[in-house]
Amino acid sequence: MNKIKVAIIFGGCSEEHDVSVKSAIEIAANINTEKFDPHYIGITKNGVWKLCKKPCTEWEADSLPAIFSPDRKTHGLLVMKEREYETRRIDVAFPVLHGKCGEDGAIQGLFELSGIPYVGCDIQSSAACMDKSLAYILTKNAGIAVPEFQMIEKGDKPEARTLTYPVFVKPARSGSSFGVTKVNSTEELNAAIEAAGQYDGKILIEQAISGCEVGCAVMGNEDDLIVGEVDQIRLSHGIFRIHQENEPEKGSENAMIIVPADIPVEERNRVQETAKKVYRVLGCRGLARVDLFLQEDGGIVLNEVNTLPGFTSYSRYPRMAAAAGITLPALIDSLITLAIER
């Protein structure tokens, strides 16, 4: 049987570049090479595409210039060797890219043009989930609770007196808590807006939600969905930003991730059902991690949806899947299969 040629794309221009490299390293270590023939394409922080042997911290050292061709006849890569391009057919693409140009529909559009099946959400659902304000509007219209929020553009000044503190100020289109600030008073607001504006021109100001933060890994296309165990983030202080820490592999500096979540089974079931509803409302396919707040009165409020969650050794999505009995090799296999079947 011929192996399935899988292009695993990692790195990228976003602030989450280093996380993406770590995710690709884990996937490379766990993909079934008896079934799949992986081709690793790294994107530098400056946006240069290169074919490399394997993802690692020094992946650029031994690499060749390569690009995905939008030509459907090529159906794959153009690789520069000895001043000439050679073509490499690809059966399916697995973008392991986080943040802008990875989770926002941009690279998904390239795969659509090229006619190559790809792991994860399509253009529309990727864009909707990446923009937190759009995700809130769509899910609220479907009857899902969301935080009170307002949007401003970079350089605008909100009417501070209309806000009930604390609030969170965050880039509307970013991830891993980059540019996110908890604001407790009017005096802190302008600095928080400036910090968020470094990552996006569209800024979200949302009401802080009391309760615990929980998450749910969802996998599948359309109605046939599989969920992982619910996890729970227990903070000692500050906000959850493990991907910005120096040594996250040794554990978070301010958070404990509990899998399964330390909540009653009935509440875990409700969180899973809410996560599946959010997934369907936003048109997700393949996979997504749905983050929610569980309030003391039992209310469940949407936080955000990550359409290409991390696959690092400390990432939440694979840990939730593992707690439900899905190993990382099996998870990778299932995600590639879902992409081909879609």
From Swiss-Prot:
Location (main, coarse): membrane
Function in brief: Required for high-level resistance to glycopeptides antibiotics. D-Ala--D-Ala ligase of altered specificity which catalyzes ester bond formation between D-Ala and various D-hydroxy acids; producing a peptidoglycan which does not terminate in D-alanine but in D-lactate, thus preventing vancomycin binding.
Organism placement in taxonomy: Bacteria, Bacillati, Bacillota, Bacilli, Lactobacillales
Cofactor binding, note field: Binds 2 magnesium or manganese ions per subunit.
Residues annotated for Mg(2+) 1 binding in this entry: E304
Induction pattern: By vancomycin.
Binding site for Mg(2+) 2: E304, N306
UniProt keyword Transferase present: no
Cofactor(s) listed in the protein's UniProt record: Mg(2+); Mn(2+)
EC numbers for this chain: 6.1.2.1
One annotated GO molecular function: ATP binding
Broad class of enzyme this protein falls into: ligase
Protein name as it appears in the record: Vancomycin B-type resistance protein VanB
Compartment(s) where it occurs, according to its Swiss-Prot or TrEMBL record: Cell membrane
Keywords from the named record: Antibiotic resistance, ATP-binding, Cell membrane, Cell shape, Cell wall biogenesis/degradation, Ligase, Magnesium, Manganese, Membrane, Metal-binding, Nucleotide-binding, Peptidoglycan synthesis
ATP-grasp domain boundaries: 136-337
Family: Belongs to the D-alanine--D-alanine ligase family.
Residues where ATP binds: 132, 168-170, 176-177, 206-213, 240, 303-304
UniProt entry tagged with the keyword Transmembrane: no
Effect of A106C: In strain: SF300
Name of the gene: vanB
Cellular component GO terms, alphabetical: cytosol; plasma membrane
